[in-house]
């Protein structure tokens, strides 16, 4: 059943109210936890019999605070899903509004900034499609997901472009994708090996450094203010959850073959996959980009 604008707005409003209540609950739970921790610190030199109940209470309150925060994050994810569903319906109905180039670039940047941060539980490893961790072999990107797609342009050259999944054709094992660039509006039917799902979560360098590309790794990265991926080398890793990579894009106009470092968000830095020609746009040279 189609999701109407009114229904979507109401569902989002309901979830925003839930989030507001979650935030209020987190504040209360944090105050209780701080009081319990203060009592625990004051009792550190007391007998185990007195310390154990305080320690147990502190752990329980911390777990409750974590659960409330995760509940709020789940509501935020639901809101993102509702908005995405409405956007897909509008596109399929032919009601998609034209987006100017500047607005598109801002949307691309905002999509990276608001990508959910993976916050694992104790001992939990970052999953597939978190940071640099690739999708599993049998994974199929969902309708509306952004991907890197190796598609032919007007000049018949293949380039890695930022695209959106329209559908997955199971019988053909191919993706139907649309160029994210409004000026192109091209649709492509591509084999699965020519489509790379983008990360669905950011990795926190402070807790999940293994989910980031190491320094000097050859990658593909979205060149700033464009919708194309090019070959690059990781120059500097993010140090915090909000920082970007710094990468060196190939550029034959420089004596060492690489341009100056540029920031690229985790969402748009993916494993390098060479094309048949092994050079040029989508696999590297930016001298004419």
UniProtKB/Swiss-Prot annotation:
Keywords: Coiled coil, Nucleus, Transcription, Transcription regulation. Signal peptide: none annotated. One of its GO terms (molecular function) is methylated histone binding. GO terms for cellular component: ATAC complex; H3 histone acetyltransferase complex; nucleus; SAGA complex. It holds the Pfam family SGF29_Tudor. It is found in: Nucleus. Residues 9-36 form a coiled coil. Gene3D superfamilies: 2.30.30.140. Residues 249-251 are annotated as: Histone H3K4me3 binding. Residues 137-278 form the SGF29 C-terminal domain. Component of the Spt-Ada-Gcn5 acetyltransferase (SAGA) complex consisting of wda/Taf5L, Saf6, Taf9, Taf10b, Taf12, Ada1, Spt3, Spt7, Spt20, Sf3b3, Sf3b5, Nipped-A/Tra1, a histone acetyltransferase (HAT) module made up of Gcn5, Ada2b (Isoform B), Ada3 and Sgf29, and a deubiquitinase (DUB) module made up of not/nonstop, Sgf11, Atxn7 and e(y)2. Component of the Chiffon histone acetyltransferase (CHAT) complex consisting of Ada3, Sgf29, Gcn5, chif/chiffon and Ada2b (Isoform A). Component of both the SAGA and CHAT histone acetyltransferase complexes, which both predominantly acetylate histone H3. The SGF29 tudor-like domain mediates binding to methylated 'Lys-4' of histone H3 (H3K4me). Belongs to the SGF29 family. This is SAGA-associated factor 29kDa.
């Amino acid at each position: 059943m189609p999701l109407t604008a009114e229904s979507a707005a109401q569902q989002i409003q309901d979830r925003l109210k839930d989030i507001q209540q979650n935030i209020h609950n987190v504040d209360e739970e944090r105050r209780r936890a701080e009081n319990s921790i203060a009592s625990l610190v004051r009792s550190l030199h007391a007998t185990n019999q007195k310390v154990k109940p305080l320690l147990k209470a502190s752990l329980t309150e911390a777990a409750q605070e974590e659960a409330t925060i995760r509940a709020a994050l789940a509501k935020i994810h639901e809101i993102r899903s509702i908005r995405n569903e409405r956007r897909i319906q509008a596109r399929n109905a032919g009601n998609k509004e034209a987006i100017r180039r500047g607005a598109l670039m801002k949307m691309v940047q905002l999509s990276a900034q608001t990508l959910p941060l993976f916050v694992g539980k104790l001992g939990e490893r970052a999953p597939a499609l978190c940071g640099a961790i690739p999708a599993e072999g049998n994974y199929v990107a969902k309708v509306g997901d952004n991907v890197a797609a190796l598609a032919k342009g007007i000049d018949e050259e293949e380039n890695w472009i930022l695209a959106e999944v329209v559908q997955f054709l199971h019988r053909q094992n191919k993706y139907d994708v649309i160029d994210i660039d409004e000026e192109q509006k091209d649709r492509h039917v591509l084999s699965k090996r020519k489509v790379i799902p983008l990360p669905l979560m950011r990795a926190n360098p402070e807790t999940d450094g293994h989910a980031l590309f190491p320094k000097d790794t050859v990658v593909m990265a979205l060149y700033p203010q464009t919708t194309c991926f090019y070959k690059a080398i990781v120059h500097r890793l993010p140090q915090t959850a909000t920082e970007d990579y710094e990468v060196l894009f190939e550029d034959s106009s420089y004596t060492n073959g690489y341009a100056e470092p540029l920031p690229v968000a985790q969402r748009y830095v993916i494993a390098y996959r060479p094309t048949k020609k092994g050079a040029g746009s989508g696999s590297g040279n930016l001298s004419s980009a």
